[in-house]
Every structure is written in C-alpha cells, then in structure tokens.
Amino acid sequence: MDDDSNQKPLFHMALGVLTSLTPPQHHIELVDEHFHDKINYDGDYDMVGITSRTIEATRAYEIADEFRKRGKTVVLGGLHISFNPEEAAAHADCIVVGEADNLWTTLLDDVANNRLKERYDSKDFPPVKAITPLDYARIAKASKRTKVDGTKSIPIYVTRGCPFNCSFCVTPNFTGKQYRVQDPKLLKHQIEEAKKYFFKANGKNSKPWFMLTDENLGINKKKLWESLDLLKECDITFSVFLSINFLEDPTTVKKLVDAGCNFVLAGLESIKQSTLEAYNKGHVNSAEKYSKIIEDCRKAGLNIQGNFLFNPAIDTFEDIDELVQFVKKNHIFMPIFQIITPYPGTQMYHEYRESGLITIEDWEKYNALHLVIKSDRYEPLLFQYKVLKSYVEVYTWKEILLRTLYNPRKLINLVTSIAFKKHLAAQLKAFERNHKMNPAMLSGVKPVMNG
C-alpha cells in the first residue's frame, strides 16, 4: 500500500487501543513512520513502545536498538513480536505477547515503579472479554494527524476475534476465536468523537469515511444487522471486511448500502476451482458465483473489492492471465493481487517451515509481492514479475475509467485507484531496474512439471 494511499487509515489500530488504555496521568506521544513522522531519539521518554507487523519487524528492531543505545527502556509488542518472542527479545528490555488490553496498565505501573519484567503474556492475565473503546480525543492529542475529509479513512472497530481457522490467517492465533462485539452506545459515542477530532467537511454532502478494521464483522448475522442499523443512524460512509458468502443475502446487502457502506473487501482468493478447493473454499465458491454476487451488489449500490492470491505450486501463468481477464470483465473495484505468504503465527507458516518450504525469512520481503516459499515450477523472480506485471495491467487508465464508470461511489473509486496505480507503477519500475527484467522474459514461460 502506498504511504499516501487514501485507503490507509489515519492511525494504526494497535496504537489507538494502547493510547485509549493508558491512564490519564501518563503523557503519550504517537509517532508513525507510515506518515513520515520523524523519530526523536533524544526525547525525554520513560518508555518507548513499538508495535509492528511482520514486514515492519526489521525496522522496528532498528528503532529499538537505537533507543536502547541511548539508554531508553524499550517495549516491543504486536503481531510479529507475539509469534517471534525470542527473536524480538534481543532488541528490547521487555516484550508483550498477545492482546495488551488486560496487561497494559500493569506494565505501565511496573515501569513507573522500576520493576518492569522481561515479558508480559496476555495468557497470564484475565481473558479480554470486552473491546476497548477508542478515545479519539486522546489519540488526536497524542498524534500528529490532522483532520481529513471524506476521501481518507478514520479507523474504528466493532468486533474482535474470529472462530474460523483459515491456514493463511493469523487472527485466531492472536486476537483469539472468541467473538466479541462492542456495546452499541459506546460505538455511537466513538463515531461522534471521531467526527469531532478527525473530520472536516468538504462540501455540503461530505460525510466522514470510516475503515472498519474488524477481522470478520459478518460472523453473526444478527449482530451484523444490529451494527449496520446503528451505523445507519450515524450519517457516515464506511468500508468493511466480509466473507463474499454473506453478500448472497439481499437483506444484508441492502442494510450495508442503507448504512453507508461504500465497499466491502472480500477474500475471493482465486477463480480456479481446484485452487479454491486447495483453500477449502471450493465447496461454497466458484467464478460464476463471484460474478453474480458482484453484479447483484453493484446494482444495489455496493462495491466489492476482491482480494486474490497466487501460489506457484498451484497457479500457472495462464491462470494468472485468466484472472486478469475475469477482473476486467467484471470491473472489480480496486482489485488486490498477492502472492501467497506464510506469515508467522499462521498454520501455514508452521506447516511450511516444518516441511522446509520457506526459503526466505527476510521480513522486509513479507509484503505479499515477494515469493518467500519454495518454487519448483517457476523461477521465483519470474513468478514475482508475472504477478506484478498483471497487477499493473488491471490498473491501466482504461481499466480505472471503466471501473469508475460501471461501479457506484465513483469518487472513492477514482481517487483510490489512482493512488494504487502510482504505487504499482513505481514498484514495477524499481523491480525491472533492480533485477534487469523486461516483458520479453515472460514470453513462452511454462511451468516445470514434476513427476
């Protein structure tokens, strides 16, 4: 995602939660390099807390090491650290494993009283049964973010946890399988506070855009409908992650549209039936089903952003070409292409590592556009190049304009697609320059067939 992408929320949800959990007597300064914030290594801090995803882990360690050189107390936590505690421990005075809601105030009290432990594990504290409401006033005061109009998103969440166990997803192993839902009254208050501190109208009909960061809002249809009814009262637009199968229900689609949903991000994974079966989705999904749902939602006023995965052990270059044509034919809203990546904490990572299939553990390459697993059928750089070239192909000016024409919510479609195009073009140019690649190298490439 481009650092300046409109689709990027205003702040990292983990930072928002920790800020909201922090007792008022503590002063907080939020610094986020995603927004080019400058780090003050000489700041008078009693503690420096750093959170990161896998792709940012190396940079997180660099920052931690620099602060520790200057005698600062460093605490590391977040997704990557929780599943690589031994690795992280070499760069921190303390590591936090799992959700921090139930341990953060204890940790801060220990810092204040010079008794900080080397490790705090969420499992050693009472279960996190309720969701922490976001304190947008405090987040605004602590951060360097300014107010935005309706073309940039403000993060919020309604639920946490997911009972499913998809092999490539880290959620059930981090936030857990217990599905927790916010108190509707608290949610409504947060939305009003977020509007007050982070939104500026741009025109008479301008509404704030909220990015719902829930892992899977649609697990419980009753709770989903209740949440949508509440969001309808708030006079906002929003986007959300949902299973494509929930969108077969016309009532759910109507409630989404009426509540102000501008698009749903759905993991479609593939249009190839054998690939869907490999992901345990072949019994419920198909390319034909996707096309129908996308068209029905479009007619109802809802965009579907499709997320697709490519696996060199399963997908051929011809499969990738067919997917590109499918995306074009169906005018899929802001499609996302990713190479299958076994992130630490997932079942897939454990299985691939045990089988010796992971070839790269340079975390900076875990951006879903590098091939980090063994590939017997394709030369890794060629496979990466094919995916990246195909990604760029669905973001030509022609395709962007056609999608804008065919899909609802035209402004967000156009503005965000242009940001995607800019970012992808820069990535492709850098890839070709760094690896001395050109399109002719992809011509006539066939997979190596074993056996």
Swiss-Prot record:
SUPFAM superfamilies (UniProt xref): Radical SAM enzymes
Cofactor needs: [4Fe-4S] cluster
GO molecular function, a single term: metal ion binding
Domain Radical SAM core: 148-377
Reactions performed catalytically: 8,12-diethyl-3-vinylbacteriochlorophyllide d + S-adenosyl-L-methionine = 12-ethyl-8-propyl-3-vinylbacteriochlorophyllide d + S-adenosyl-L-homocysteine + H(+); 12-ethyl-8-propyl-3-vinylbacteriochlorophyllide d + S-adenosyl-L-methionine = 12-ethyl-8-isobutyl-3-vinylbacteriochlorophyllide d + S-adenosyl-L-homocysteine + H(+)
Protein transport in keyword set: no
Cofactor note: Binds 1 [4Fe-4S] cluster. The cluster is coordinated with 3 cysteines and an exchangeable S-adenosyl-L-methionine.
Single GO BP term: methylation
UniProt EC number: 2.1.1.332
GO CC terms: cytosol
Compartment annotation: Cytoplasm
Binding, [4Fe-4S] cluster: C162, C166, C169
Keywords: 4Fe-4S, Bacteriochlorophyll biosynthesis, Chlorophyll biosynthesis, Cytoplasm, Iron, Iron-sulfur, Metal-binding, Methyltransferase, S-adenosyl-L-methionine, Transferase
Keyword Metal-binding found: yes
PROSITE patterns on file: B12_BINDING, MTTASE_RADICAL, RADICAL_SAM
Domain B12-binding: 1-118
Pathway: Porphyrin-containing compound metabolism; bacteriochlorophyll biosynthesis (light-independent)
Function: Involved in the biosynthesis of the major light-harvesting pigment bacteriochlorophyll c (BChlc), which confers a significant competitive advantage to green sulfur bacteria living at limiting red and near-infrared light intensities.
UniProt record similarity statement: Belongs to the radical SAM superfamily.
Identification of the protein by name: Bacteriochlorophyllide d C-8(2)-methyltransferase
Organism in which the protein naturally occurs: Chlorobaculum tepidum (strain ATCC 49652 / DSM 12025 / NBRC 103806 / TLS)
